[in-house]
């Protein structure tokens, strides 16, 4: 029983209250038609009858079961398939959006159609249209969508042996590997996904996928690539390549609207309490201390929380931050252009997107160090890295405030950014290599 409660608690910590409620309803009531909105490690309830090892393992790792695909005869027509959990609005920021941009550019280069298979939520085509339009991209071929839910095995779809599958997580990779040749898979890896878990079965299975030598890898940033190789995944050096993400000025740029004379400056915090790697609780402690020490003067700064599932909170003598959630990509980009200073934490080696989004939009950003992620000035001199501890981050915010209000220096740093501004440039080498093979 203790183990059951621990699994339920772990599920809640990872996926949040909304997903936990859905899971509880699924366990206690009739099975819903749609699967939960995120890959889950199912809570295994006691059974009246003994189950085999295979049955228990299958129930525990249902998301790893092979995709329900059937093979079609060879066809001269080309298709690329992206396999991901969801393309809902809240899922598109960062990694999934990157996968769709990459797949679109590759499909256009290869003269291929593009299919998106989702596993946890029905695909919403309008969301793909929105992100492509924001970046000025148009798919030349046909766009297709298919929902193959994790928890339902009565739906299937087709594939051909020449089809290229772009997977977006270790679990979508594992599921796809059960149905198509390994040589057909390109795993778009955008985080050290082992760090999603404590040491246990999930982490072990994740590492087994990350260590495979029969699939190709595309890694988001050289920083993450170097970390993975240095941490024992030598197959990544042999079977993988990396890219640096792009931040086109048509999307991320300083706002053209001047601040009102005497108007308050904007401070943003990337607030995702249910994504533990974002160090939400350290972040709010840092903000509280920064206010107490007058680093963030509430007469000068508006505090904005951007994220998901953010609880109501007050700072200082009752100040409530502004909350912005469930924004579209264009709304998020527009907000980023109005920010002066940001705090965005990520307790992994990857720099993560929000600090880079903000730096590309002209803001100063404080983030934390982790492993080989010690300095991000290669991207922008407006990025300040500090140890992941309260005092160090408060001091970094003090430096950030000074830089944010020093408009000439801040602008000079912005103009000297080392961020790529063109996705076609970011992916050019990979796209040419793949186009030559497929």
Model-identified regions with their sequence ranges:
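Conserved active-site histidine-acidic residue motif and adjacent donor-binding/catalytic loop
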Residues: 148-153, 309, 320-336, 351
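Membrane-proximal helix-turn-helix segments that form the acceptor-binding/catalytic region
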Residues: 154-160, 200-218
């Amino acid at each position: 029983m203790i183990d059951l409660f621990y699994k339920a608690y772990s599920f809640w910590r990872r996926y949040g209250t909304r997903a936990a409620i859905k899971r509880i309803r699924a366990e206690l009531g009739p099975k819903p038609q749609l699967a939960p909105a995120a890959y889950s490690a199912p809570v295994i309830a006691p059974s009246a009858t003994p189950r085999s090892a295979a049955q228990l393992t299958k129930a525990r790792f249902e998301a790893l079961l092979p995709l329900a695909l059937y093979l079609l005869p060879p066809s001269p027509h080309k298709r690329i398939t992206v396999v991901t959990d969801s393309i809902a609005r809240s899922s598109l920021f960062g990694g999934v959006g990157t996968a769709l941009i990459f797949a679109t550019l590759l499909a256009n280069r290869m003269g291929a159609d593009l299919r998106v298979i989702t596993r946890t939520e029905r695909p919403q085509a309008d969301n793909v249209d929105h992100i492509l339009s924001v970046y000025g991209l148009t798919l030349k071929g046909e766009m297709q969508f298919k929902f193959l839910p994790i928890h339902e095995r009565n739906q299937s779809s087709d594939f051909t042996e020449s089809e290229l599958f772009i997977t977006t997580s270790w679990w979508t990779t594992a599921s796809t590997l059960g149905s198509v040749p390994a040589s057909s898979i390109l795993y778009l890896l955008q985080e050290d996904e082992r760090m999603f878990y404590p040491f246990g079965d999930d982490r072990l299975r994740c590492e087994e996928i990350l260590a495979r030598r029969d699939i190709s890898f595309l890694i988001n940033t050289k920083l993450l690539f170097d970390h993975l190789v240095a941490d024992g995944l030598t197959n990544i050096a042999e079977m993988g390549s990396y890219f640096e993400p792009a931040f086109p000025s048509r999307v991320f740029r300083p706002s053209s609207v001047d601040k009102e004379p005497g108007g308050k400056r904007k401070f943003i915090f990337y607030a995702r309490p249910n994504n533990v790697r974002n160090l939400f609780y350290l972040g709010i402690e840092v903000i509280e201390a920064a206010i107490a020490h007058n680093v963030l003067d509430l007469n000068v700064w508006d505090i904005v929380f951007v994220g998901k599932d953010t609880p109501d909170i007050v700072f200082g003598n009752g100040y409530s931050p502004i909350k912005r959630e469930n924004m579209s990509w264009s709304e998020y980009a527009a907000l980023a252009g109005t920010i002066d200073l940001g705090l965005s934490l990520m307790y992994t080696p990857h720099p993560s997107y929000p600090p880079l989004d903000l730096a590309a939009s002209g803001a100063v950003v404080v983030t934390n160090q982790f492993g080989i992620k010690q300095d991000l000035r290669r991207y922008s001199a407006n990025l300040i890295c500090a140890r992941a501890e309260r005092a160090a981050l408060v001091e970094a915010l003090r430096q950030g405030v000074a830089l944010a209000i020093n408009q000439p220096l801040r602008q000079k740093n912005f103009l000297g950014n080392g961020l790529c501004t063109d996705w076609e440039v970011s992916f050019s080498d990979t796209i040419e290599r793949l186009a030559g093979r497929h």
